[in-house]
Curated annotation (Swiss-Prot):
Protein name: Shikimate dehydrogenase (NADP(+))
Gene that encodes it: aroE
Organism: Nitrobacter hamburgensis (strain DSM 10229 / NCIMB 13809 / X14)
Tagged with keyword Oxidoreductase: yes
GO molecular function: NADP binding; shikimate 3-dehydrogenase (NADP+) activity
PANTHER family reported for this sequence: BIFUNCTIONAL 3-DEHYDROQUINATE DEHYDRATASE_SHIKIMATE DEHYDROGENASE, CHLOROPLASTIC (PTHR21089:SF1), SHIKIMATE DEHYDROGENASE (PTHR21089)
Residues binding shikimate, per UniProt: S21, R22, S23, T68, N92, D107, Y223
Complex and partners: Homodimer.
GO biological process: amino acid biosynthetic process; aromatic amino acid family biosynthetic process; chorismate biosynthetic process; shikimate metabolic process
Record-level GO cellular component terms: cytosol
Lineage: Bacteria, Pseudomonadati, Pseudomonadota, Alphaproteobacteria, Hyphomicrobiales
Active site feature: K72 (proton acceptor)
Length: 285
């Protein structure tokens, strides 16, 4: 809840359990930079207490919130979602519009904003190839369609999940079995990994990067480790890359703007601050 240490406007992160998050570090950096009196807390809310907490968010002292696992789908149902949140099926940012508590999903802006910053012109180079068909994949696909990408190949080990997502988003999205990767890689201007493969403790992603065009961009939503084996291999081949930390930073921009009235920038200083935090072991809380 809001405390004496968070006088002024305050937002929070709602999750269960409340594991270590970099969101307070990011938002407190921006609050200091813009001279705004306020704060950003972590609130550990169990599923059975979520509805009460969200319905009385302002009573608890908050002007808005981020939502993380396992609450994103339920938060969508408890608020007034925008088109993005409805299409993705999950809300990660809550804010007040008058007395109405609205929700959106800023993963789209995080993904696209990161690509624009890390690889300008990425959207002018061929088809997009997306690996994985989970919640993160929905945000990626929505963003690619919104940007105007005409052909999105969606690869998943479970073909039924890829087909279901393709059915939702229409003819632009073409489901593909993992065995068909080799046929699509030569014409993919953008490769996006939305799976957990390559994450710390997970096996690396096995993919034939030499088949990609030399001007292709490779993006990975994983940010621990900061440079996944996929990104390291892509960089070694001279391909442009976009890492998961960049997406994390860019997705936070819109929430801060909605809550505190200033649109912050993702600066090298902020990135260095979060990179330093990533190198520190943090036990789950």
């Amino acid at each position: 809840m809001m405390t004496a240490e968070t006088k002024g406007r305050a937002a929070c992160l709602i999750g269960w359990p409340a594991a270590h998050s970099r969101s307070p570090l990011i938002h407190h950096y921006w609050l200091r930079l813009h001279g705004i009196a306020g704060g950003y807390n972590i609130e550990a809310i169990p599923p059975e207490g979520l509805a009460e907490f969200i319905m009385h968010l302002s009573t608890h002292g908050f002007v808005g919130a981020n939502v993380t696992i396992p609450h994103k789908e339920r938060a969508l149902q408890l608020t007034a979602p925008d088109e993005r949140a409805r299409a993705i099926g999950a809300a990660n940012t809550l804010y007040y519009d008058g007395k109405t508590l609205r929700s959106t999903n800023t993963d789209v802006e995080g993904f696209i904003g990161n690509l624009d910053a890390a690889a300008p012109g990425w959207d002018r180079t061929g088809d997009a190839l997306v690996l994985g068909a989970g919640g993160s994949s929905r945000a990626v696909v929505f963003g690619l369609i919104e940007r105007g990408i005409k052909r999105i190949h969606l690869v998943n080990r479970t073909m039924e999940r890829a087909q279901a997502l393709a059915d939702q988003f229409g003819a632009t999205v073409m489901p593909l079995a993992w065995s068909g990767l080799g046929d699509v890689l030569p014409r993919a201007g953008l490769l996006v990994n939305t799976t957990s493969l390559g994450m710390k403790g997970q096996p690396p992603l096995d993919i034939e990067l030499p088949l990609l065009p030399l001007d292709a961009v490779v993006a990975d939503l994983v940010y621990v480790p900061l440079e996944t084996p996929l990104l390291a291999a892509a960089r070694a081949r001279g391909l442009r890359t976009a890492d998961g930390l960049g997406m994390l930073l860019h997705q936070a921009v819109r929430g801060f703007e909605l809550w505190f009235g200033q649109r912050p920038a993702v600066s090298p200083e902020l990135r260095a601050l979060v990179e330093a935090d990533l190198r520190i072991p943090h036990p789950a809380t």
